[in-house]
Design a protein with these regions (language model features):
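NAD(P)H-binding glycine-rich loop region in Rossmannoid oxidoreductase-like domains
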Residues: 50-61, 77-79, 83, 92-134
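Helix N-cap at the beta1-alpha1 junction of Rossmann-like dinucleotide-binding domains, i.e.
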Residues: 63-68
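Charged, amphipathic alpha-helical linker segments immediately N-terminal to NTP-binding catalytic cores
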Residues: 1-5
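N-terminal Rossmann NAD(P)H-binding glycine-rich loop of SDR-like oxidoreductase domains
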Residues: 33-54
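A short, basic/flexible loop-to-alpha-helix module at the beginning of a structural domain
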Residues: 8-32
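Conserved SAM-binding loop
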Residues: 72-73
Length: 150
């Protein structure tokens, strides 16, 4: 099945940009420290792999799903190998005290990607799910911004 043909394209969406800006991307990533929150989810894994490929000084990945994190690390190790930088994963909730301790103990990050989210949830389902959705998708982002500033 030719997915590109199905969506009316001949090339993946960002191929040209990645090719044109390859040097700038590599310099930016190679010289910086990254934190990816929700890094074991579908989008998080793709972002983590792209950063990893460019050998950052540090790449720390946080995700609440230990199983998805194990799969991410196995996939990266089997396809991309290792980097010179500090690559670590943490199976913790980004709203937890452990997460706060991690951020406070870190050397800081140049870039933080918050890709954590409750998806596929009908927010009108019940008030408890709605409260959790607001906590994960909004309040944890606000807390991370505050922790990064401190």
């Amino acid at each position: 099945m030719d997915i590109l043909k199905m969506i009316g394209r001949t090339e993946p969406l960002f191929n040209e940009d990645i090719t044109n800006y390859r040097k700038e991307l590599e310099e930016l990533v190679t010289n910086n420290r990254f934190l990816v929150i929700g890094g074991a989810g579908s989008i998080g894994q793709a972002v983590t792999r792209e950063i990893f490929k460019r050998n950052p000084i540090a790449l720390h990945v946080v995700d609440i799903s230990e199983n998805n994190m194990v799969e991410l690390v196995r996939d990266i190790r089997s396809t991309l190998g290792y980097i010179d930088g500090d690559f670590r994963t943490f199976s913790i909730d980004c709203g937890s005290d452990e997460y706060k301790a991690l951020i406070r103990a870190s050397e800081g990050y140049d870039y933080i990607f918050n890709l954590s989210a409750l998806k596929h949830v009908r927010s009108e389902k019940d008030p408890y799910t709605l409260m959790r959705l607001i906590e994960v998708n909004i309040l944890n982002t606000i807390k991370t911004i505050q922790l990064a500033k401190d």
